[in-house]
Amino acid sequence: TYDPGVELYEIGDDLERSSELELMIPHPCVIGNTIGSIYQKELGSLLIRAISNRLKYQNIRCNVSDAWFLSDKNHFVFAFSGVDKANLLQQVSELSNEMESIQKNGFKQEEVEDAINEHLRRLKVDNSTQLSSKWCDDFVDYVISDDRYIQSDSEMKQLADKIRATDSATLQQLLREWLSYKDQTLLVAYRNNAGKQNSLKKEEVVQAWDEGIKNPLKDFTYARKDVKEERVVTPA
């Protein structure tokens, strides 16, 4: 369990490297034991991919992830790196502004299609002979969390079809759900590499996030990158 509100953990560091800031939002994890629930897990991964692509496209420096942490909780994480506190807080505002834009305006259709195609390329049924250690890991996952895995081509096709049918509204709804848990608990980890004068208060993080939401939303136009056809050289 987590205490309600914002919890900030700061560590001083005098090595020559950037300061780092992580915002972690605990939220319920999904147990994948049916095609529907496995799709819900994959939907989370698809959302992370779509957000990451958008941030890269908008030149917003932030690494986004979502992974199981403990018990029945995942951590939805935004990670930043910067020269000092002011720089990090500016990045938080830019990130929250883009999250607000996605929640209100969604992803472009081409954005969703590209994210889906990227995601589907990594999905496959593992028909190879598994080591005993892998079987043990799978069994532990099943016993602890009831997670199951896709084991046939027909099941994978069902899953892929559901993923292909995903639209922006579905991803927006999931993003709103995850971000809503920020109002319950927000964990902030800060590695201060810029001295005591750059010590951070949790109120400053909240203020930076709120400022980003209040700022005018940026215009966004998505243009697909040209994919060069791979040249295949055949033997003479």
Where does each model-flagged region fall?
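Proteolytic maturation boundary segments
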Residues: 1-26, 32-33, 37, 48-52, ...
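A structural supersecondary motif
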Residues: 24, 48-82
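Feature marking long nucleic-acid-engaging regions of large polymerase/nuclease enzymes
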Residues: 28-41, 53, 66-69, 107
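Intrinsically disordered or highly flexible coil/loop and linker segments, enriched in small
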Residues: 32, 52, 56-61, 101-108, ...
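Detector for Asparagine
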Residues: 33, 53, 59, 63, ...
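M16/insulysin-pitrilysin zinc metalloprotease superfamily fold
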Residues: 70-130, 145-149, 159-165
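Aromatic/basic-lined ligand-recognition segments
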Residues: 135-136
